[in-house]
Amino acid sequence: MTGSEAHEVEARLKQLGVEKKLFADALDWAGAEARLCTGFDAPAMAGITFWSRTNRYLAEHLTDPAEQDPIWKYTARDSILRVVHPSGSHAITAVSGSGGVGDLERSVRSKNPKGRVMAQLVENNTKYERSGQGVFSSRDEVEFGGELDSMPLWFLLYERNEEDGTLSAELSRPKKMEGKYVNEWSERLPLFSRTDPGLDIALLDAPDDDGDLDFEVRKTN
């Protein structure tokens, strides 16, 4: 990424009310928390912990009056953990990605399948874009009703590279799904690549928002 491109990303992040350090700190803390998991935890626990703690960090810091003015809002409706901009202009959720997270020369998709509610949110992103409305149409107050479903949703995508162990991240706005996977984006803002988080975060990282979880049952001797 060139210097001018990096400057454009920084400017766009500022418009969205966030900065790279927030996301870097969130992922670092999530990694530290996930590393506490052991072989006695459920097989997917490290991935779930990493996902949950990343979203928790964003929520705790963006809703803290000592760190943010005005504060953001938070909701876990439909099992989709979201922080909502004070104006109600957009929301952000952290999910794992796959492909080329952070590399605009490569395609990227959500790592894990998404359910009916997420599919509707992605579709609403496209409708909002086509309507010609700006991303920053202010509201005096966000009521978590229909407004939450219609506001643009951004993904903080993260991915661990299996070859060198680096953790890459980007902030992107989804616009289309293929099957249960988000694979097309209106905007992609590369953030950074960081050192190995020290664990496999490529496992299931969130409950399906349709409410049905699948568990593999193995017979032991």
Locate predicted features.
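Interdomain/boundary linker segments immediately adjacent to catalytic/signaling cores
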Residues: 1-49
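Short N-terminal edge-element motif at the start of the domain
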Residues: 37-40, 46-69
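A short acidic/basic microdomain associated with nuclease active sites
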Residues: 63-94
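Catalytic cores of nucleic-acid endonucleases
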Residues: 99-162
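Glycine-rich, aromatic-bearing surface loops/beta-hairpins
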Residues: 140-221
